Amino acid sequence: MSAASTAPVLSVAIPAHNEEHCIARCIESIAASARTAGQPVEVVVALNRCTDGTQAVAQALGARCVVDDTRCIAAVRNAAVRATSAPAVATLDADSWMAPGTVAAILMHVNDPRTIGGGTVIWPERMSIGIFFSLLSIAPYVIRRGVSAGMFWFLRESFDAIGGFDESLVSVEDVDFALRLKAFGRARGQKYGTIRRHGITTSCRKFDQFGDWYLFRNPRLVKAIFEGTNQRAAEGFYYDIER
């Protein structure tokens, strides 16, 4: 992402399980956004039980890779963040990609002393009536908590202060992280922010696999996933998925 002699001002931490078909687009979007911002950005990929070419693709694009084979996405996210070197960090899933203005937006917000960190608006790569209603079935679980997720951005010191992602959770570790980051900021007189104009786009591979209406038609599954500790629900929707 930058010359070796230039210290990064932002690190992007990516968890990856067999993502050779997606991660190039993700990393390339970060590089393009960093060039637009004119700032050095580091990419760290945490490889999780990878049996494909994820590592080779990521390293060829300048990313640094670490390995964490724990069957827990929170642990993998933590491994990626803890391997970063910049004072500011963003987390991004391997099947998502930044907009050209995302890096600049992150740096503007994360260095604002009034803000503790935050999330982003997430745009699906495609839309259908089924996806719309499936997203509506998820929205109440997030909106009522007053946080955004998708791609988190924060100072590394804030991440360390709240202990990172909760590794006792098998799902919705992202929402839990957002709530704890928000509470940490509130205690310091800081607000939780959302990057809206320069958000991220994410793949619809879950909908491609399960069907666009799947979440809408399975409200019990949605509820179970948002419990955070339902192993069976998490394994069926996340951990046992072949790529």
Which residues make up each language-model segment?
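Glycine-rich, basic loop-to-helix element that forms the pyrophosphate-binding segment
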Residues: 68-84
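Acidic donor-binding/catalytic loop of UDP-sugar-dependent glycosyltransferases
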Residues: 53, 94-108, 179
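Short beta-strand/loop segment that forms part of the nucleotide-sugar
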Residues: 39-49
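Conserved donor NDP-sugar-binding/catalytic core segment of glycosyltransferases
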Residues: 100-130
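Short aromatic/hydrophobic "clamp" motif used to bind/position activated sugar donors
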Residues: 89
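Cell-envelope/extracellular polymer assembly enzymes that use nucleotide-activated donors
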Residues: 9-11, 42, 176
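Short, well-formed alpha-helical segments that are part of the catalytic scaffolds
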Residues: 19-34
